Amino acid sequence: MSSVPAPREYFLDSIRAWLMLLGIPFHISLIYSTHSWHVNSAAPSWWLTLFNDFIHAFRMQVFFVISGYFSYMLFLRYPLKHWWKVRVERVGIPMLTAIPLLTLPQFILLQYVKEKTENWPTLSAYEKYNTLAWELISHLWFLLVLVILTTVSIGIFTWFQKRQETSKPRPAAISLAKLSLIFFLLGVAYAAIRRIIFIVYPAILSDGMFNFIVMQTLFYVPFFILGALAFIHPDLKARFTTPSRGCTLGAAVAFIAYLLNQRYGSGDAWMYETESVITMVMGLWMVNVVFSLGHRLLNFQSARVTYFVNASLFIYLVHHPLTLFFGAYITPHISSNLIGFLCGLIFVMGIALILYEIHLRIPLLKFLFSGKPPVKRESRATIG
């Protein structure tokens, strides 16, 4: 436990908030993309598909690196049990709150929009369970993964801390090239695990809870650990905050490979395994691209930025049902994909900000959507 707080990393706070808020244009562009979603426009847009694919190819990898960085920073600051309790509450309470208040109404809405209400009674018990798992967790999956990673990392972080206490500080003797090789091998290992599961028991890959708890956690744990290592080794963080032409070019090539795999790959062949390798290394390279840009452009304190940093989780939680409502009832009346996309951004962001301001004025909702208990203010005793 450290009594000396680490200096505030404004650029990491800002990047994390921007990555969260990118979920809004990501899901709105999904409506207008060639990808099949809950709701789609009459005619897809190639450039919105490209935009959607680009965000999807790297956003969450970078997010989990930042999560690992801050998680380990707080791990050093608080006792173990308090750290785990606070971290789980901060993500677990908003997730559990959003299920009955957001994703359950969203599920009911989609049942009517997609005219599936009559089919529900005909589903088996497992089909109902699995449908609810996918639909109720929905866009909250990363919160579930964060709870799991926080719990799993107890042993890993404790080991890191003991090594720090018993070993002399020394630079992390690893280059971005070596890291790229490591993450390439991790991508291959993940692809091999998925292929083995596909051969042995393919049905389990369609199970919602297995996907969230096992497959998503396995994929993102290297990025979470990388974030912790970046906090331990300042020189490693410096590699990410220093622009690298190799990482930029590598990310561009990886994205082209990602698009080609999307276009020509087959789900019955090696499409998903290939994608895991590509997005594993692209995620690493985009950490450098995003961190270096963020360090240059966002490393300052601003009341406006702080507002959106604090609001980003709430906005992300409520944007998904708002996006689906827009796609189901407003998109069909807008013929232009560009105008529809821009209207969607204004509609979703505007209502989300209004809801955010309303929830700030209701203490119970403020607690439920943040996981932060209200701060107790001690009254001043009168002297005299």
From Swiss-Prot:
Primary subcellular site in the record, as a coarse category: membrane
A biological process term (GO) from this entry: glucan biosynthetic process
Disulfide linkage: none
Secretion signal span: none
Pfam families, A to Z: Acyl_transf_3
Top-rank EC class of the record's enzyme: transferase
GO CC terms in record: plasma membrane
Name of the featured protein: Glucans biosynthesis protein C
